């Protein structure tokens, strides 16, 4: 199926593969996936870094960001400018437009804002969905609003 070309890397593997400048202070490597994110044959490793951002009776919150690293040269090709807030870690890398190049799909709370009731239930937030993909014009990877 569509996921056959992706290999999910276990949490504890590969700390040595992380370029030091990829790790922001207080964030930890959570998971990664290898995929072809641009027009050359070398694979990229899409890394998710995160940290806890609060625990509630029915859900947990996390802060996270992404880094896309050339798997061969270990150069950072993309790093999130912003830190996102979410209630689940998700690393969704798929080639939905079938052009042979994968895109990173992310969802997060708009402006990091959310509300709960006084008992910590009833999470309300506006979810944003972005697509981060390689752009031939600029020869790099950049976020797109869908």
Residue ranges and their predicted role:
Residues 1-23, 92-146:
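Acidic, small-residue rich beta-repeat scaffolds with periodic aromatic anchors
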Residues 19-27, 83-84:
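Extracellular beta-rich ligand/substrate-recognition surface
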Residues 25-37, 87-96, 101-102:
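Beta-propeller blade termini
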Residues 39-50, 98-108:
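Acidic/hydrophobic-patterned starts of short beta strands in beta-sheet-rich repeat architectures
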Residues 51-56, 110-114:
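Short glycine/acidic-enriched loop and turn motifs that connect beta-strands
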Residues 59-64, 124-125:
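Short coil-to-beta strand junction motifs in C2/discoidin
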Residues 71-72:
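Short loop/turn segments that connect beta-strands within beta-propeller blades
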Residues 76-82, 142-146:
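Beta-propeller fold detector
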